């Protein structure tokens, strides 16, 4: 569903932020 897509994008986004720390 739409929420699964949003959650997946959130995980990817969070991963990118952590890599930039």
Swiss-Prot record:
Expressed by the skin glands. GO terms for biological process: defense response to bacterium; defense response to fungus; killing of cells of another organism; regulation of defense response to virus. Keywords: Amidation, Amphibian defense peptide, Antibiotic, Antimicrobial, Antiviral protein, Cytolysis, Fungicide, Hemolysis, Secreted. It is found in: Secreted. GO terms for cellular component: extracellular region. It comes from the Eukaryota. Coiled coil: none annotated. The modification Leucine amide is found at residue 21. Antimicrobial peptide with activity against Gram-negative and Gram-positive bacteria (MIC=13 uM against E.coli, MIC=25 uM against S.aureus) and fungi (MIC=25 uM against C.albicans). Also shows hemolytic activity (HC(50)=50 uM). In vitro, shows moderate inhibitory activity against HIV. Belongs to the frog skin active peptide (FSAP) family. Brevinin subfamily. This is Brevinin-2-related peptide.
């Amino acid at each position: 569903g739409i929420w699964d897509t949003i959650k997946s994008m959130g995980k990817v986004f969070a991963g990118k932020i952590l890599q930039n720390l």
